[in-house]
Design a protein with these regions (language model features):
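Structural detector for short beta-strands of small beta-barrel domains
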Residues: 32-49, 56-58
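N-terminal leader/targeting segments
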Residues: 1-28, 127-132, 139-142, 154, ...
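Short nucleic-acid-contacting surface segments enriched for D/E, G, S/T with interspersed K/R
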Residues: 85-111
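Aromatic-rich juxtamembrane segments at the membrane interface
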Residues: 148-275, 280, 284
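OB-fold (S1/OB) nucleic-acid-binding surfaces
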Residues: 49-80
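OB-fold/S1-family single-stranded nucleic acid-binding modules
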Residues: 55-61, 116-168
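Internal transmembrane alpha-helical bundles of multi-pass membrane proteins
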Residues: 265-438
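Residue-level "contact hotspot" at macromolecular interaction interfaces
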Residues: 28-30, 35, 87, 101-102
Length: 438
């Protein structure tokens, strides 16, 4: 399993094998001639670095020009003006009465479009902090390097019409995400940060704090990752004393699926889900996994994800996620004995895991983004527990607010105290600037 995963990784990233893109856009007209496109939204909208648009992936059905129309297949990146996307969001100033367009996954949109040339599209793509799913081609282009990764065609939506939902489940998800935004809006900046942690939506996250997370080497906390799933697994594990280990494992799987459905299947979330799924299957087969077994789970997840989700292979989130876990499994055991000589065992284990992940991801971070944050070695050890407590307390608070809405403002004080502690810690470590290579 490990040899197969290593060979596959070398073949993919050395460009010896170029996987076919199942989502490559195809239609019978030149891209420059396209004036209209219709299809279903297949990703969460995320604000671009310019702040003028929201970027999303559209699974195209039809395309047309002024004098003809044809069927289309594959995906495009659609840039929708902020005022249209934010029309339904709480606290925003825009209002499009009777013309509201819910821009969420599963919505069918009919748009008149204008193509954006690749040379001018870099400033209109999603920021890496908004989920960490920046493609390797975009990242390397931003660093001045060339990439042969095929680019998704980019279009600006000049007019957009909502034409229904793909199914009732997509509609339920969109309404649930909108309702969560309205609940968390009452908690101010604390609610904005919690919204980013729960759903991957960064519309209400304090921009200075988001930048501080990056400067402090903590961008992985804002990105949906395995850390979030591990918290759900830990919560479900407490039920094993009531229902048994196997039932608790099933509950963990249900909670993970529900979270991925609500937040969206980012590459790092899929990686974490596959690793846990393999581990749960092993548990049902009464197979005890050691650290070597955990590495086998990671290799199995890598093979499955590259086989079925080609679009993830060259994303920064995919590469950094696997590199981080590989570093924890392979490097941290060599660091742990040294740290145990002067640190308590629990702290040494946490520090060695952080060091392993940092050492494994630093070369990739330098190549993809042009900088590294050495302070992340220390900040992750201190801030990650604070973020976990804030995340768990926020989820519990939202649960009670949904049942008893009058508790919304009563719980606000607790959330604000936890947010202040987390914010202070992040801003402190952000004073140590990252090292730039550009």
């Amino acid at each position: 399993m490990r040899i197969a995963a290593v060979i596959l990784a070398l073949a993919l990233y050395a460009r010896m094998v170029k996987p076919a893109d199942p989502y490559a856009f195809r239609c019978c007209m030149p891209l420059d001639k396209l004036g209209s496109i219709s299809g279903f939204v297949v990703s969460n909208p995320s604000k671009t670095s310019s702040g003028r648009f929201y970027s999303l992936l559209l699974d195209a059905e039809r395309a047309g020009s002024a004098d003809m129309s044809c069927s289309a297949r594959g995906r495009i990146r659609l840039l929708v003006p902020c005022e249209l996307v934010e029309a339904l969001y709480p606290g925003k100033l825009f209002s499009l009465s009777k013309k509201d367009v819910p821009v969420e996954q599963g919505a069918r949109l009919v748009c008149t479009v204008r193509r954006v040339k690749e040379s001018s599209a870099s400033g209109m793509l999603p920021t890496s902090s908004a989920g960490g799913a920046m493609s390797a081609s975009v990242a390397t282009t931003a660093c001045g390097a060339k990439s042969d990764t095929p680019a998704v065609p980019v279009f600006i939506a000049e007019t957009t019409v909502f034409a229904g939902w793909k199914n009732g489940i997509c509609r339920l998800r969109a309404l649930s995400r909108l309702y969560l935004k309205r609940v968390l809006y009452a908690w101010g900046d604390a609610g904005g940060l919690l919204l980013a942690l729960v759903s991957g939506s960064h519309e209400y996250t304090d921009e200075k704090l988001a930048q501080a997370f990056q400067n402090a080497g903590l961008a992985h906390i804002l990105a949906l990752s395995g850390m979030h799933l591990s918290l759900f697994i830990s919560a479900a594990s407490f039920s094993k004393f009531l229902v048994g280990k196997k039932a608790a494992s099933v509950l963990s799987l249900i909670l993970m699926c529900a979270f991925m459905w609500f937040a969206g299947a980012s590459p790092s979330l899929v990686r974490a889900f596959l690793c846990v799924l393999v581990a749960l299957i092993a548990r049902f087969l009464f197979i005890e996994l050691s650290e070597k077994g955990s590495l086998d789970c990671l290799c199995a997840a890598f093979i499955v994800q590259t086989a079925f989700l080609h679009a993830d292979i060259y994303s920064a989130a995919f590469m950094l996620s696997y590199a981080a876990i590989a570093g924890i499994l392979l490097i941290s055991p060599f660091v742990r004995p040294f740290l145990c000589t002067f640190l308590p065992q629990k702290l040494a284990e946490s520090a060695s895991a952080t060091a392993g992940a940092w050492l494994a991801t630093t070369p990739l971070t330098a190549v993809l983004f042009g900088h590294i944050a050495p302070v992340g070695l220390i900040s992750s050890i201190i801030v990650t527990p604070l973020a976990s407590v804030f995340f768990i307390a926020g989820c519990i608070g939202v649960f009670f607010c949904l049942i008893l809405p009058f508790l919304l403002y009563s719980l606000n004080g607790i959330i604000q105290v936890l947010y202040a502690a987390l914010k202070y810690a992040v801003l402190f470590f952000a004073r140590f600037k990252p090292i730039d290579f550009l």
